[in-house]
Design a protein with these regions (language model features):
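Electron-transfer interface patches adjacent to heme c in soluble/periplasmic c-type cytochromes
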Residues: 109-152, 177-187
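The canonical Cys-X-X-Cys-His
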Residues: 81, 87-97, 149, 191, ...
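C-terminal capping alpha-helices of c-type cytochrome domains
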Residues: 144-159, 173, 177-205
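Electrostatic cytochrome c docking/interface patches
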Residues: 52-86, 100
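Surface-exposed patches in mature extracellular/periplasmic domains of secreted proteins
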Residues: 92-96, 161-168, 172, 202-208
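Signal peptide processing junction and immediate N-terminal pro/mature segment
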Residues: 20-41
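Sec-dependent N-terminal signal peptides
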Residues: 6-21
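Positively charged n-region of N-terminal signal peptides that target proteins for export
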Residues: 1-4
């Protein structure tokens, strides 16, 4: 080991890099066998990765297309909910029409969301019309309490209407509730808190 250090010093003086490895480490590497031979234990990603909630919350506020009423609301959940809602295509089905004239990105135009009808429902899918998600006069998004809101997204059960043939048991159609139902309680609560903060709008129906 002493000889190795002397050689390393000489190399360093010559401007060359040097790595000294102890004999015990070399012995450990040479005698290791099979899949259990590990000299370094990697740290779990979760423990070393930074918490990016703050960036998602700020991104949510940046994406919100309407003024938000934050009185009595959890600001962090509102921001996170805005991020989820505004990056999950909710506007495409729950705003009628989703974009103002000249603001449809699918037509190659700069995106301009229709804020006058934002998330107020009214898109006609033939036998299904999208729901108004804005707060009612009691401040309840879609007229649902938080528990009801989470129940709907977990089960798809339509609490507003009975089942209509061919759709039995009042299950929501078109709305991708099986996807949203897999989100955490915190994420669903954040969506609800965001919807509580947006302005009320009457349903915007399609022109006759």
């Amino acid at each position: 080991m002493k000889r190795q250090l002397l050689m390393c010093t000489a190399l360093a003086m010559a401007g060359l890099a040097c790595l000294v490895v102890s004999p015990s480490v070399i012995a450990g590497l040479s005698t290791a066998k099979g899949p259990t031979a590990k000299t370094i234990q990697p740290q779990p990603v979760a423990s070393s990765a930074p918490d990016n909630d703050e960036s998602l919350i700020q991104r949510g506020y940046d994406l919100a297309p309407v003024p938000l009423n934050l009185t009595g609301k959890n600001r962090a959940l509102v921001g996170l909910g805005s991020y989820i809602v505004n990056t999950s295509g909710c506007n495409d089905c729950h705003t009628n029409p989703p974009y103002v004239a000249g603001g449809d990105p699918f037509a190659g135009e700069p995106e301009q969301i229709n804020v006058d009808c934002y998330l107020s429902g009214g898109v006609d899918f033939g036998i299904v019309i999208s729901r108004n998600l804005t707060p009612n006069s009691q401040g309840l998004p879609a007229g649902l309490t938080l528990d009801q809101f989470i129940h709907v997204l977990r089960t798809g059960e339509d609490l507003k209407s009975p089942g209509n043939p061919p759709f039995d048991h009042g299950l929501l159609q078109v709305m991708p509730w099986p996807v949203f139902g897999k989100k955490s309680d915190r994420d669903l609560t954040a969506i609800y808190e965001y919807l509580r903060s947006i302005p009320h709008r009457s349903r915007c129906l399609s022109p006759a």
